[in-house]
Each structure stands twice: as C-alpha cells, then as structure tokens.
Regions:
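Conserved glycine-rich cofactor-binding loop
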Residues: 11-12
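Active-site Tyr-X3-Lys motif and surrounding loop/helix of classical short-chain dehydrogenase/reductase
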Residues: 69-76, 95-99, 103-110, 206
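Catalytic Tyr-X3-Lys loop
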Residues: 82, 98-117, 139, 164, ...
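Catalytic loop of short-chain dehydrogenase/reductase
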Residues: 90, 133, 139-163, 168-177
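A short, exposed helix-loop element centered on a Lys and neighboring polar residues
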Residues: 120-121, 169
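Alpha-helical segment proximal to the catalytic Tyr-Lys
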Residues: 125, 173-174, 235
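Short, small/polar-rich loop/turn modules that mediate ligand/substrate recognition or access, typified
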Residues: 176, 181, 237-239
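C-terminal substrate-recognition "lid" of short-chain dehydrogenase/reductases
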Residues: 215-244
Length: 248
C-alpha cells in the first residue's frame, strides 16, 4: 500500500484519532497542525512507534501561502498525495448572532471554510486524472450542527459547516469522473477539546441526555467512519454526508 494521507488539524481530537487509525491501516500520514507542535509530534511518535510512517507539518490552512508550502513539502518528501481529511476547524465562545463581531465571523469562516477549499483545491490538483494523478479520496469533517443550527451558541460555526456540506456535494460531482471520491462525516456530540475551546467544557456531559444513544461519542468512533470512507471498501461511495451523531 502506498497511500499518502494529509490530515489537517491532526494534532488533537478527531484529527489525531484519524491519523493514528489510518497509519495502522497502512497509510503514510502527514499530520498538519496550526500551533501545537508538541501535540502533533506526539501523534507522529505514536505512529512511528507502531511501525508507521508520519511527519508533522505546520501550516495555517486559512493562509494560502502556507497551504501551498505545505503541499509542496508533501510533494518533495512523500510524493503525490492520494488522500485528504479536511479536519482543521475552530469554534468560538457561545453567542447570539446579534452579538457576533466581524473579526469572529472572519476567523470562523476563514479556517473552517476557506481552509477546506484551499486544501481540497491543492489535493484535486494532485489526485485528479485530469492533471495526471492517480485518483484519490477526500473526506471533509462537517458537523451535525450544519442541520441543527446551534442557536444562541454557534450559528456561525453551524453555517460554516453547512458550507462544507455543499463543498462536499458539489466537488464530488465535479471530480467524480476524475478518479476522486469526496464525502463528509457529520460528527454530533463528540468528547474532544473543541468544547472547552468554545467555552463549554462540560457540554458533552450536559447534553448527552438529548442523544438517543444517551451518550457522547469518541474521536475514535468518528475516525472509524472517516477511514472507511477513504478506503477501497467505500469505492462506490461519493457525495455522502455520513452522520456519526448517535441519532441526534
């Protein structure tokens, strides 16, 4: 197996779990991170300890220059990319829309939406048979928030993830005949650090009763869905939005 995978936002949570699982499946993994080098290197160390191949590359996915430099380095050090997980994302403190600043909105959309578009664009340039590539697979990490709306908390984040759903559907149709499958997962209430960064560290515990399965999910459970979508086992699956939300 000579599959080269880039996981953006791969230093923690769903991204880290995906990188670790994919490495166990035989992927050579590039762990992208924005600022937490120590966490990214820990993921790389764990992959290497298990006999896998991995490297950590810093890049702010909202910065086109940094994205171009990251992909150029992957080309040089690993070869042609065959798989991408667009996982990098941020959420802010709970607020109503009428309280949100332009600065907040720009940050949410720059990282969650523009970053995903930039990385998808560069991946397609390398994977597409139209560009001489071997084909490949892209999985975008959306959110159940894209259909729930997150009122009085994160409507901006929910809207950004709605854009990711449309990116998934449109791009899947655009490159389906060029050897590339594009899918998304929609995680629900998942026990990761993103809740603390959004000001609600106990959110999973407090909302678990709203989930039909009566619990939050784990990053590893989301990673299982992502890695399946990347794999040949999902060879006829594209344009899908896979719910990993416990039924909520």
């Amino acid at each position: 197996m000579d599959e080269i995978l880039l996981v953006t936002g791969g230093s923690r949570g769903i991204g880290a779990a995906t990188a670790l699982l994919a490495a166990r499946k035989g992927y050579r993994v590039v762990v992208n991170y924005a600022s937490n080098e120590a966490a990214a290197q820990e993921v790389v160390r764990a992959i290497r300890a298990g006999g896998g191949t991995a490297a950590a590359i810093q890049a702010d996915v909202a910065d086109e220059g940094q994205v171009l430099a990251m992909f150029a380095r992957i080309d040089q050090e690993f070869g042609r990319l065959t798989a991408l997980v667009n996982n990098a994302g941020v959420v802010d403190q709970p607020q109503r829309v009428d309280e949100m600043s332009l600065q907040r909105l720009k940050r949410i959309f720059d990282i969650n939406v523009i970053g995903s578009f930039l990385c998808a664009r560069e991946a397609v340039r390398r994977m597409s048979t139209r560009h001489g590539g071997p084909g490949g697979a892209i999985v975008n990490v959306s959110s159940a928030a894209s259909r729930l709306g997150s009122p009085a908390q994160y409507v901006d984040y929910a809207a950004a993830k709605g854009a990711i759903d449309v990116l998934t559907q449109g791009l899947a149709k655009e490159v389906g005949g060029e050897g590339i499958r594009v899918n998304a997962v929609r995680p629900g209430l998942i026990d990761t650090e993103i809740h603390a960064s959004g000001g609600l560290p106990d959110r999973v515990k407090e909302l678990a009763h709203l989930v039909p399965m009566q619990r939050g999910g784990s990053a590893e459970e989301v990673a299982q869905a992502i890695v399946w979508l990347l794999s040949p086992e999902a060879s006829y699956t594209t344009m899908s939005l896979v719910e990993v939300s416990g039924g909520r």
